[in-house]
Amino acid sequence: MIEVAVQAEPDWADGTDWERLAIEAVTAAMRTTPHAAMLDAAYMAEVSIRLTDDDEVHALNRQYRQKDKPTNVLSFPMVQDDLIEGLDNSDDGEVLLGDIILARGVCVREAAEKGVPTAEHATHLIVHGTLHLLGYDHIEDDEAEAMEDLERVALATLGIDDPYAITED
């Protein structure tokens, strides 16, 4: 089973059901991977999502990635990707897959630039972050293409258009 714990700062209160959105995004992302069975596993896998401000994400980005600026999403995996397959053997029946942290200001700005609702862009970022928790990355071009393909599939199941499509104005 999967549990998605959402903590949203007050500036995220815009009428969106962030908990529902996060659960749907995490589930959609997981279903696109070989780890989909985790959704129905006997153990409880938890993903923690924090919706916060640019200042907090800036500080975390500086501390953990040595990048002195805010970013849209940070992911902090708690399970090494090569150990995910063995989670069925978890002693206590629970495992924290990791944390996903979104920056409100960056998310709102990027959504406006893309001409999409903030909730739609945040969904994409949560899908992206979930894939990072499952061991996917985009350092190399082939990894980036594979990860983007998974994102497209997950988002399509949620009725969200390809975020990487180039549109002509």
UniProtKB/Swiss-Prot annotation:
UniProt entry tagged with the keyword rRNA processing: yes
Subcellular location: Cytoplasm
A molecular-function term among this protein's GO annotations: metalloendopeptidase activity
The record's free-text note on cofactor binding: Binds 1 zinc ion.
Main localisation: cytoplasm
Annotated residues for binding of Zn(2+): H128, H132, H138
Pfam families: YbeY (PF02130)
EC number(s) given by UniProt: 3.1.-.-
Swiss-Prot/TrEMBL GO biological process terms: rRNA processing
Gene3D superfamilies per the UniProt record, alphabetical: Metalloproteases ('zincins'), catalytic domain
GO CC terms, sorted: cytoplasm
Alphabetical UniProt keywords: Cytoplasm, Endonuclease, Hydrolase, Metal-binding, Nuclease, Ribosome biogenesis, rRNA processing, Zinc
Domain of life, source organism: Bacteria
Described purpose of this protein according to its UniProt entry: Single strand-specific metallo-endoribonuclease involved in late-stage 70S ribosome quality control and in maturation of the 3' terminus of the 16S rRNA.
Annotated NCBIfam families: rRNA maturation RNase YbeY
Name of the protein: Endoribonuclease YbeY
Protein's organism: Rhizorhabdus wittichii (strain DSM 6014 / CCUG 31198 / JCM 15750 / NBRC 105917 / EY 4224 / RW1) (Sphingomonas wittichii)
